[in-house]
């Protein structure tokens, strides 16, 4: 999986890069069956202080799968918690998409009259 990381309003430290890579390792396991053409874009940063008190961090994850774009966003007072929440949400969407694809294959086999595998 190809990963691009960018930061807005904060400096991109080695600790942030390591945290993102560690969290994305879970997603990498889920997308291996889609091939090496899967791209992930992660954006981390601080949000505007317009209506919120204190510092709020935002993490966005975009994963481009064949035929699907997965988007997840999370806000939290802790940057690392926001990264974790966004990656978990993206993982849930990828799992759901994989399940839908499997269901489509089963339906197609039923329609064609072939044997259905469990």
Residue ranges and their predicted role:
Residues 1-118:
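N-terminal, polar/charged subdomain of small-to-medium soluble alpha/beta proteins
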């Amino acid at each position: 999986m190809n990963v691009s990381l960018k930061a807005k309003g904060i400096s991109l430290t080695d600790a942030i890069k390591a945290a993102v890579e560690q969290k994305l390792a879970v997603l990498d396991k889920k997308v291996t069956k889609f091939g090496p053409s899967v791209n992930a874009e992660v954006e981390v940063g601080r949000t505007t202080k317009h209506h919120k008190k204190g510092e709020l961090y935002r993490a966005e994850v975009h994963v481009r799968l064949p035929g699907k774009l997965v988007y997840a966003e999370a806000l939290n007072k802790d940057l690392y918690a926001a990264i974790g929440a966004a990656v978990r949400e993206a993982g849930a969407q990828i799992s759901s998409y994989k399940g839908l694809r499997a269901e489509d294959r089963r339906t197609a086999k039923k329609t064609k009259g072939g044997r259905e595998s469990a």
